[in-house]
């Protein structure tokens, strides 16, 4: 049997060489022929051309999936995307390392009844992404380094729900502002929250979260969505702020925080940062480096992947414009936004390539590239173009908007920009921009939203002030800021009718890091209790203190509490300087954190 398959593969190799285009019967195949860095959980996605009888793909023997040692894989067959996409899922995951052969036999037929020419292709299983924490720490260290120069070092830590202060207002557009605070700054620390505010800075909704969260937004279907960093996925809430769904990447990929777009057909778009150990990136660069690629996925209403774009297949690592490729960690794309274009294709923003890329959503091929090393456009009225941008969006007039962080402008400055694109003659004409006076510079994050009345909401990202709203003539009508050193990833403005007397309740049990830390001699310890069941309206809370050896010092708290956020003071006046631990037990939940007493 093995000899038979070897003969079949040999004959197929000859067939492929002789065939002018063995893939001409298919608009899209994923994994791509010859692709590498494929996950063990990968599915095979096939989009046949319209003249293929898609039902013949499900016949026994029409498609075979073979491993490198000629072991045939059994698989399930599913049709998605209105009958246009076939998804094959092997009964058992692939095993790395291996070469996988996908063989299309002459049992696959066209709508006229004729058979296709048999062919096969292969791709390479190289295991799943390496530990994402390596890159998480690396990425955050870059942001923090940029942020330190912007933070007022005298700013105190902000606990609980941060205040949003209006610094200027002159008839802003109606609506509510949706945002979140970034919390993992070295100084000051602050409590992660999901926030909705009115034009006067009053919070109409706030929810303290146990860990960092991002991208609070309203989707076209009316759901409120946000990314929960502790869970590594997006969650959706209804208008009562109740979690009703979750969204995450498929095919073994982790879910990135930068973007979730829910489409009108129930599909959704996400991205994943794919961390790989690369033996050789070419040229004189070091061997054996850790590289972050990007995966763009479209998933259907059943959360099956129906489309996938992988940077490994289309971008070069050397496409990065300002990354130091001599380092051991390389983030060459750093994609941060996805937009469904008016023609149904995709636009993605890749910050570290200084590039907006248009991708054919049917074939997965690149249509054009704007900015960066592979720029195909001529910039008009904007000779320097954009630098390390965020927030690609196609607006109603057909133009695109961006938040230009401007990291490599000289000197650096940030702005909101609008281009009119001629996609035939490849020109990008700057038709509008807003640049604050004096300049505001945000080294990372940020967003631009064109509002219904043609005003523009600008979230300044990793700096203060937090956001502003401007008219098309450049007149500022609103400016708001979080406390100094507290930033927001994005901000949006939408019509929204808040619930009357809505309670601000935590979503989960949590023990929050004490503040200040280090401390002398008093510090505050906070904890949260989510909504409780009807059977139990209170929860017993026990907090104990231990020294660095684990010896019990004292019981700080033993009492019953209802749902909410609480704090308790710990006084270390009678203790020596050193490391201590505080531990909480609330029902089945327990946690321990470290604190440092310095005298």
Describe the residue ranges of each PLM region.
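C-terminal outer-membrane/trafficking sorting elements
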Residues: 15-18, 198-199, 508-515, 519-599
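Exposed beta-strand and adjacent loop surfaces of beta-rich binding modules
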Residues: 43, 60-62, 191, 538-542
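Sec-dependent N-terminal signal peptides
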Residues: 3-14
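Histidine-/acidic-rich catalytic cores in large beta-rich domains
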Residues: 127-503
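Surface-exposed loop/edge segments in extracytoplasmic proteins
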Residues: 69-76, 203-204, 476-477, 551-557, ...
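Blade-terminus and WD-like Trp-Asp/Gly-His loop motifs, strongest in beta-propeller folds
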Residues: 79-82, 217-219, 263, 516
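Positively charged n-region of N-terminal signal peptides that target proteins for export
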Residues: 1-4, 599
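Acidic, low-complexity Ser/Thr/Gly/Pro-rich repeat segments typical of extracellular/periplasmic
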Residues: 20-132
């Amino acid at each position: 049997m093995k000899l038979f398959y070897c003969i079949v593969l040999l004959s197929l190799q000859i067939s492929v060489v002789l065939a002018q285009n063995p893939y001409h019967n298919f608009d899209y195949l994923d994994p791509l022929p010859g692709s590498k860095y494929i996950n063990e959980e990968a599915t095979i996605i096939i989009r046949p051309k319209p003249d293929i009888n898609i039902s013949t793909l499900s016949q026994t023997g029409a498609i075979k999936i073979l491993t490198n040692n000629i072991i045939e894989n059994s698989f399930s067959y599913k049709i998605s995307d209105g009958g246009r996409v076939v998804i094959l899922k092997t009964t058992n995951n692939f095993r790395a390392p291996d070469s996988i052969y996908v063989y299309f036999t002459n049992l696959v037929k066209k709508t006229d009844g004729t058979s296709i020419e048999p062919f096969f292709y292969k791709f390479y299983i190289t295991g799943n992404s390496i530990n994402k924490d390596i890159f998480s720490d690396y990425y955050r260290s870059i942001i923090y380094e940029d942020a330190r120069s912007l933070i007022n070092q005298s700013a105190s830590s902000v606990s609980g729900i941060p205040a949003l202060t209006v610094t200027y207002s002159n008839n802003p557009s109606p609506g509510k502002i949706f945002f979140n605070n970034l919390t993992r700054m070295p100084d000051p620390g602050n409590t992660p929250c999901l926030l909705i505010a009115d034009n006067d800075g009053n919070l109409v909704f706030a929810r303290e979260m146990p860990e960092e969260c991002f991208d609070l937004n309203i989707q076209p279907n009316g759901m409120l969505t946000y990314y929960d960093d502790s869970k590594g996925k997006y969650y959706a809430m209804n208008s009562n702020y109740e979690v009703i769904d979750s969204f995450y990447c498929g095919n073994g990929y982790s879910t990135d925080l930068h973007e979730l777009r829910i489409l009108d057909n129930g599909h959704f778009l996400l991205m994943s940062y794919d961390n790989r150990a690369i033996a050789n990136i070419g040229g004189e660069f070091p061997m054996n480096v850790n590289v972050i690629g990007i995966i763009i996925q479209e998933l259907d209403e059943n959360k099956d992947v129906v489309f996938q774009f992988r940077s490994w297949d289309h971008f070069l690592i050397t496409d990065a414009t300002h990354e130091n490729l001599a380092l051991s960690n390389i983030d060459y794309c750093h994609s941060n936004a996805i937009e469904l274009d008016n023609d149904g294709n995709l636009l993605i923003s890749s910050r570290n390539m200084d590039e907006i890329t248009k991708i054919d959503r049917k074939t997965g091929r690149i249509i054009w590239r704007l900015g960066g090393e592979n720029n195909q456009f001529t910039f008009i009225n904007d000779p320097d173009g954009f630098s390390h941008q965020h927030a690609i969006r196609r607006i109603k007039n057909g133009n695109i908007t961006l938040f230009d962080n401007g990291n490599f402008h000289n000197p650096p400055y940030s702005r909101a920009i609008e281009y009119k694109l001629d996609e035939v003659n490849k020109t990008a004409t700057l038709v509008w921009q807003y640049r604050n006076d004096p300049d505001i510079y945000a080294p990372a994050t940020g967003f631009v939203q064109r509002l219904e009345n043609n005003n523009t909401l600008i979230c300044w990202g990793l700096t203060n002030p937090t956001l502003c709203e401007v008219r098309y003539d450049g007149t500022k009508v609103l400016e708001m800021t979080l406390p100094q050193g507290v930033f927001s990833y994005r901000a949006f403005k939408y019509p929204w009718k808040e619930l009357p007397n809505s309670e601000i309740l935590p979503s989960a049990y949590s023990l929050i890091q004490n503040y200040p830390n280090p401390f002398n001699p008093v510090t505050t310890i906070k904890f949260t209790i989510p909504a409780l069941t009807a059977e139990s309206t209170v929860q017993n809370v026990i907090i104990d203190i231990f020294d660095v050896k684990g010896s019990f010092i004292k019981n700080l708290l033993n009492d019953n509490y209802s749902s909410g956020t609480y704090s308790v003071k710990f006084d270390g006046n009678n203790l020596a300087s050193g490391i201590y631990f505080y531990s909480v037990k609330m029902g089945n939940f327990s946690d321990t954190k470290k604190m440092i007493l310095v005298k």
